[in-house]
Curated annotation (Swiss-Prot):
Keyword tags: ATP synthesis, Cell membrane, CF(0), Hydrogen ion transport, Ion transport, Membrane, Transmembrane, Transmembrane helix, Transport
PANTHER family: ATP SYNTHASE SUBUNIT B (PTHR33445:SF1), ATP SYNTHASE SUBUNIT B', CHLOROPLASTIC (PTHR33445)
SUPFAM superfamilies referenced in this protein's UniProt entry, alphabetically: F1F0 ATP synthase subunit B, membrane domain
Transmembrane feature ranges: 21-41
NCBIfam families attached to this UniProt entry: ATP_synt_b, PRK05759.1-3
Subunit comment: F-type ATPases have 2 components, F(1) - the catalytic core - and F(0) - the membrane proton channel. F(1) has five subunits: alpha(3), beta(3), gamma(1), delta(1), epsilon(1). F(0) has three main subunits: a(1), b(2) and c(10-14). The alpha and beta chains form an alternating ring which encloses part of the gamma chain. F(1) is attached to F(0) by a central stalk formed by the gamma and epsilon chains, while a peripheral stalk is formed by the delta and b chains.
Lineage, uppermost ranks: Bacteria, Bacillati, Actinomycetota, Actinomycetes, Kineosporiales
Pfam families in alphabetical order: ATP-synt_B (PF00430)
Purpose: F(1)F(0) ATP synthase produces ATP from ADP in the presence of a proton or sodium gradient. F-type ATPases consist of two structural domains, F(1) containing the extramembraneous catalytic core and F(0) containing the membrane proton channel, linked together by a central stalk and a peripheral stalk. During catalysis, ATP synthesis in the catalytic domain of F(1) is coupled via a rotary mechanism of the central stalk subunits to proton translocation.
Organism: Kineococcus radiotolerans (strain ATCC BAA-149 / DSM 14245 / SRS30216)
Name of the protein this chain belongs to: ATP synthase subunit b
Record gene name: atpF
Membrane topology classification: Single-pass membrane protein
Amino acid sequence: MLVAAFAAAGEEVEGNPTYPILPHLGELIVGIIFAIIIYAVIAKKVVPRLEAMYEERRAAIEGNVEKAEKAQAEAQVALEQYKAQLADARGEANRIREEARQQGAQILAEMREQAQAESERITTAARATIEAERVQATAQLRAEVGRLATDLAGRIVGESLQDSARQSGVVDRFLADLERSESGASSR
């Protein structure tokens, strides 16, 4: 039947010539039917697959964009944490440096104080030793001067002054008079 329709469409109809540009009615109907069939197949089979592929691609792109934004946000948070940690570390380093400086100054002050105390202790001990030696030397000199004075007086007088109580009294009196005369001379 189709073939007949095609055959009929290609012939002249009652003396009217057919135009090669104008399709025959049978061809037109067959073309429309095939176009509808192709459209239906494309609409039912191809378009949903294309839509699904398009949706998958769009979701993948959006997912990648979201992942990139999320990664960028995480990187920004990590950068902020790093900056905060770096600022904390710098503050801690400054604090430790200042503590070390203060401890160094404190240790230096303590060492100076200890050195000063040691110096004063040594000076005091030296003065005490010198004073003790001076007292001892003075006592020895008094005894020696007394003995020499007694010997000299005994020679001058011609009698022995070996009595120790008497000798001691004479020497002490003589030295006391001598000290008084020196004190009187220095105060003038």
